[in-house]
Structure formats: structure tokens, C-alpha cells
Amino acid sequence: MSPDNWNDSSLAATLLVMTSTAPATATPEDILRGAGLRVTAPRVAALHAVGESQHATADDVLSSVRAELGTVSVQAVYDVLHALTDAGLLRRIEPAGHPARYERRTGDNHHHVVCRACGTIGDVDCTVGHAPCLTPSDDHGFVVETAEVTYWGLCLDCRT
């Protein structure tokens, strides 16, 4: 599906609401312990911030963590985001021309749609086959684990 062919119903049908692979009843503390990480206030606050913002920038997380905890350094937030990403609790995405974003939806191989006008990002489920959704014509001996696809277009708000 190319952005030129998007319409309200096809776009709405492919966008997903952000979900985490952790059970709905799991607390941030449970999630951290389950990943073998120490439970710290900045880590808990960062998980909460990313969960609330879906595709949060580091600045979004910093603002939220500071609102919750008070003084926290920029470096501390970047360290937390790095640790949570390395542990597989967050996924870092980097749409071209946009700051890195963090999301809690991990463990699957979904893709993203980005509005060229306002930068809104939505999740798009893997549309064909099993992960990684795309089969390269030549894998050069690699074992392909994921494929990253970014759809670009205009969201409903920016089209009106």
C-alpha cells in the first residue's frame, strides 16, 4: 500500500493502538525485575512516560520524569533509555528527519506510518507473512530477524 493510495478506511484499518507485550497487570517494577534490571525511580518513571506517550522522544521522557521525580539529569534519562532498550523493554525508532522515538511495543515486527506535516507516528501491523514481513532477494548470508518499514503520508488531521 503506497501513501498515495491511503484513504480513511484503509489507514484506519492498518493503524494499531500501542500495546506492550507485558501482561496488562504487570507493574513497571515487575517488568524491570522480569528483565533482570534493578528497580529505580528513574526507570519506573521512564517506563510510565513512554507508555503514556506511545512514541516518545527523549525530551518527552525527560519532561515527564522530571515532573514525576523532580531533578533528574539529561544524561540519567539517556542512560535509562539505553538500558531499557538494551533489555528489550523499549524499542527505539528513528524516522528520517525526526528525533529518535521510544515505544513500549516490543517483541513483534510492526512498522510505522509518519505524517509528513505534523510528525504524528502510528503503528502498522506486519501486513504479509511472518516476521520479518519482507524477504530480501539476497540476504548475503545474514539471518534476517527484523525489517523496518516506514510509511509516509498525511494524517487525517493534516489532510483537512
Please state what every model-predicted region is.
Residues 1-23:
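Short, intrinsically disordered or compositionally biased N-terminal tails of bacterial proteins
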Residues 14, 23-36:
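Short, Lys/Arg-enriched N-terminal segment that forms or immediately precedes the first helix
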Residues 39-41, 52-57:
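Short capping segments at the starts of secondary-structure elements
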Residues 44-49:
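Pre-recognition alpha-helix immediately N-terminal to the DNA-recognition helix
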Residues 56-65:
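Short acidic, hydrophobic short linear motifs in intrinsically disordered regions
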Residues 73-74:
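Short coil turns linking two alpha-helices in DNA-binding domains
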Residues 77-87:
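Basic amphipathic alpha-helical segments that dock to polyanions
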Residues 87-160:
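Non-DNA-binding regulatory cores of transcription-related proteins
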